[in-house]
A protein has these predicted regions:
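Sec-dependent N-terminal signal peptides
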Residues: 3-14
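Compact alpha-helical subdomains of small soluble proteins
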Residues: 55, 59-135
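Generic cytosolic/nucleocytoplasmic N-terminal low-complexity/intrinsically disordered segments
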Residues: 1-2, 16, 84, 88
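Residue-level signal for mature regions of secreted extracellular proteins and peptides
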Residues: 9, 39, 108-109
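Immediate post-signal-peptide N-terminus of mature secreted/exported proteins
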Residues: 17-56
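Short, intrinsically disordered, low-complexity terminal segments
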Residues: 13, 17-19, 91, 112
């Protein structure tokens, strides 16, 4: 009877499922990425100087979502490397194409640049602590 209770106790702990922690990490990181990726995609499409610092800040934020160990960080890095177009909404993809084409078209370049500047302003406001010294 004691052995049965001990077996039941072990089967109910996190050690019984070695993938439980990885599932939690994936869920947290994908949730965060789905929130920030539209902004990152648009900054990239606008060829913004804010793209790389904002991307790096976002990666650092995902490190804060996981336990502080090498295996967790490796999972985070792998997710960021493979996520680029795997979660893109078709409407966002259409917007990216319009921005890229608009920047190449002399008739629309001014309007698209204004929209990109508005995005830059939004990002600087949203991440004010990151960009407060870079006027």
């Amino acid at each position: 009877m004691k052995k049965l209770l001990l077996l039941l106790l072990f089967s109910m702990t996190a050690s019984a499922n070695p993938y439980a922690e990885a599932i939690k990490i994936h869920s947290a990181v994908y949730s965060y990425i789905s929130e920030v990726s539209p902004t990152l995609y648009m900054l990239n499409a606008c060829n913004s100087d804010l793209y790389v610092p904002t991307l790096m800040f976002s990666v650092e934020q995902t490190y804060n979502l996981v336990p502080a160990n090498a295996q967790s960080y490796e999972i985070v890095n792998t997710i960021w490397k493979t996520q680029e177009h795997s979660m893109m909404d078709p409407r966002l993809e259409a917007s990216l194409i319009m921005v890229k084409q608009g920047l190449r078209n002399p008739e629309t370049v001014t309007e698209v640049q204004a929209a990109c500047e508005a995005l830059n302003s939004y990002v600087k406001t949203r991440f004010y602590w990151e960009y407060s010294t870079s006027g």
